[in-house]
Amino acid sequence: LPICESWRIPYADSLSSLAASCDAVFVHSSTASHFDVVSTLLNAGVHVCVDKPLAENLRDAERLVELAARKKLTLMVGFNRRFAPLYGELKTQLATAASLRMDKHRSNSVGPHDLYFTLLDDYLHVVDTALWLSGGKASLDGGTLLTNDAGEMLFAEHHFSAGPLQITTCMHRRAGSQRETVQA
């Protein structure tokens, strides 16, 4: 294939042939395909880093974790903001912060998926980044989820505590602008 040739990437015509030629694979595919793709790779003895979320539901996610443990393979869920240089720099400066707020707003992103899908597909980035920045030892104090009549997410906001650090995460799916901010 031209793209493979231009980047000198060996072509694989199936997941099993790809697995046979790799020690590790990064999976960036639809969430619905994660369980099948990741389990195929793990069963082939390949270490896996998969873009979030690990699976469509908790049961499948737990099955993948158990499979990786049984096979003694690395299974990592990737969140791209954890590797962004500015977020890494901010993380080093949070020791003296009293509050952390992360907002991700979209101007017209309501639907077509339900609340559950949007929480796992998009809002999860906001919560994960905020909790990672805080060191991951936060407890949920409360929050709000708003949907329209079709069950699609309009707004989410949650409040966490990590020792003296107060954390707020927020997403508005029908805001006046596209914006992602972090304040500490």
Predicted feature locations:
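Beta-loop-alpha module in the N-terminal Rossmann-like domain of NAD(P)-dependent dehydrogenases
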Residues: 7-49, 53-65
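Short loop/edge segments at beta-strand edges and connector loops
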Residues: 13, 29, 50, 77-79, ...
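Active-site phosphate/pyrophosphate- and oxyanion-stabilizing loops and adjacent acidic/basic residues
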Residues: 16, 88, 92, 127-131
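A contiguous active-site-proximal alpha/beta segment in oxidoreductase catalytic domains
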Residues: 32, 55-111
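Rossmann-like dinucleotide-binding domain that binds NAD(P)(H)
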Residues: 108-179
